[in-house]
C-alpha cells in the first residue's frame, strides 16, 4: 500500500500547506514525539502547531511547558487542566468536558487542519473528540497497543474510532486497529516515535553525574510508578510496597520520579515526599535527555511506565514491571513482571543484580528503531483531501 494514496488510488492534493496541531499533556509524551515534531517542522508541506495542557501547566510537576520552548518548539496555545482532576474520576470527567469546549475554540482560532495525538491519555481523548466534532482530521499515534491494566486503554480504542489516520508501532497493533474496522489505507506501520533517535537523544553520563553527583553508573534503580486505581490511599500503600521490595537485594541508590496526573497520583506523591530511604532521591521532573541518560545508565528500571516496555530495550536496561498497568503490551526480553509484592520484587532484583553488577540485555526492540518521525511526516505531507479523510466507513 502506497501511504500517499487514498482509497481510490488518487494521489494526494499538494496545493496547500497543512497545519498540524500537536496536543500534548505530559512531559513524557512531548519528549517521545520530539523527533516527529522536528520532522513535521522541516517539511515544506506542513506547518507545526503545539497546544500544551495537562501536566505541562502544573507547577507541582515542574511546569514543563518551559521544556517545550527549550527544545526549540513554540507553544501556540494553552488549555487549562485543573490540578484537582487527579484527585477523583468525577473531577477528571469535568475537566475533560471543559477541555473539549476550550480545545474546540483553540483549534478554530488556529485554523488547524490535522490534530495529532498520542496514546490513551484523557487529554488526547479530549483533543480527538473536539477535533472530530469540529471536522478536523485526527491523526493518532500508538493506536492498537494494549495495556489491559489501565482504564485509559478504553480511551485508546475510543480515540482510534475518532481518528482518521493511524500511526501504529507494531504489526500486532496494526492488526488490532484493522479488527476495529478501520480502512487499511488509513493505517500506517511506522514504529514507536519514542524509540526514534533514542540513543542519540540521551544525555551523556557526565551530564547525569552533574545533575546527580551521588550516583554510581549502573549502581542505582530508576523508579517510575504511575497510579492504576483512583484511590490515593491504595496507591500510597502500593508505592510503599514497591519501596519495601527495592530496599533489599539490589543497588542501594534510587532515583524516584513523580507520577503522571491520573486520579490516584496524589497518593504516590505523598509517599515520595515522605521518602526517608538512604540513597533515594525523589524528583518531580527531569528533561527528556536526562531521563533517557538515567534509564541507559541505571542498573534497572522499576515501576509501571510504558518507557520500560517500549524504550528501555534499546539501551539493554533491565526492567521490573510491577502490577497490572502494562498487562497485555508486547514486551522485550529485558522485562520481568511481578506484582505489588516485596518478595516478588526482591526475587526479580536478584535475577538482574548478580555479584554486585546488573545484567544487560542485547535484544532487538519489538517497537522498532530509527525513522518513525520521518515516516509520520511523510504520510502527513501526502494525505488525500480532507473530504476523503473525514468520510469514515467501517471496513468490517
Question: Model-derived features: where do they sit?
Answer:
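A generic structural motif
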Residues: 43-49, 250-254
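Donor-nucleotide binding loops and adjacent catalytic segments primarily
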Residues: 57, 68, 203-297
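A donor-sugar binding/catalytic signature common to diverse glycosyltransferases
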Residues: 117-118, 125, 140, 166, ...
Amino acid at each position: 500500500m502506497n501511504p500517499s494514496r487514498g482509497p481510490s488510488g488518487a494521489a494526494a492534493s499538494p496545493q496547500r500547506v497543512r497545519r498540524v496541531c500537536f496536543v500534548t499533556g505530559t512531559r513524557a509524551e512531548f519528549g517521545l514525539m520530539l523527533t516527529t515534531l522536528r520532522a513535521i517542522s522541516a517539511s515544506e508541506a506542513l506547518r507545526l502547531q503545539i497546544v500544551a495542557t495537562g501536566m505541562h501547566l502544573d507547577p507541582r510537576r515542574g511546569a514543563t511547558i518551559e521544556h517545550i520552548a527549550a527544545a526549540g518548539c513554540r507553544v501556540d496555545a494553552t488549555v487549562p487542566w485543573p490540578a484537582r482532576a487527579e484527585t477523583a474520576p468525577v473531577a477528571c470527567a469535568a475537566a475533560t468536558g471543559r477541555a473539549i469546549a476550550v480545545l474546540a475554540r483553540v483549534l478554530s482560532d488556529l485554523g488547524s487542519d490535522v490534530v495529532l495525538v498520542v496514546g490513551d491519555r484523557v487529554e488526547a481523548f479530549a483533543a480527538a473528540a473536539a477535533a472530530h466534532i469540529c471536522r478536523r482530521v485526527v491523526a493518532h499515534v500508538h493506536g492498537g497497543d494494549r495495556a489491559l491494566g489501565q482504564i485509559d486503554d478504553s480511551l485508546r480504542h475510543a480515540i482510534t474510532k475518532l481518528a482518521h489516520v493511524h500511526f501504529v508501532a507494531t504489526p500486532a497493533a496494526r492488526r488490532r486497529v484493522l479488527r476495529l474496522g478501520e480502512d487499511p489505507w488509513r493505517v500506517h506501520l511506522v514504529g514507536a516515535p519514542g524509540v526514534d533517535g533514542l540513543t542519540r537523544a540521551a544525555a551523556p553520563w557526565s551530564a547525569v553525574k552533574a545533575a546527580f553527583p551521588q550516583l554510581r553508573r549502573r549502581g542505582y534503580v530508576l523508579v517510575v510508578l504511575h497510579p492504576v486505581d483512583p484511590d490515593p490511599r491504595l496507591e500510597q500503600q502500593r508505592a510503599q510496597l514497591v519501596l519495601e521490595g527495592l530496599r533489599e537485594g539490589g543497588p542501594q541508590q534510587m532515583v524516584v520520579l513523580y507520577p503522571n496526573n491520573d486520579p490516584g497520583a496524589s497518593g504516590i506523591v505523598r509517599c515520595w515526599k515522605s521518602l526517608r530511604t538512604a540513597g533515594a532521591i525523589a524528583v518531580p521532573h527531569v528533561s527528556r535527555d536526562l531521563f533517557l541518560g538515567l534509564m541507559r545508565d541505571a542498573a534497572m528500571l522499576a515501576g509501571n511506565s510504558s518507557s520500560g516496555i517500549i524504550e528501555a530495550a534499546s539501551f539493554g536496561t533491565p526492567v521490573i514491571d510491577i502490577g497490572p498497568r502494562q498487562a497485555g503490551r508486547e514486551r522485550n526480553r529485558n522485562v520481568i513482571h511481578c506484582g505489588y509484592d516485596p518478595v516478588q520484587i526482591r526475587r526479580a532484583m536478584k535475577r538482574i543484580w548478580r555479584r554486585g553488577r546488573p545484567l544487560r540485555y542485547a535484544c532487538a526492540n519489538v517497537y522498532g528503531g530509527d525513522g518513525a518521525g520521518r515516516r509520520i511526516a511523510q504520510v502527513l505531507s501526502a494525505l488525500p483531501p480532507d473530504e476523503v479523510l473525514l468520510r469514515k466507513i467501517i471496513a468490517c
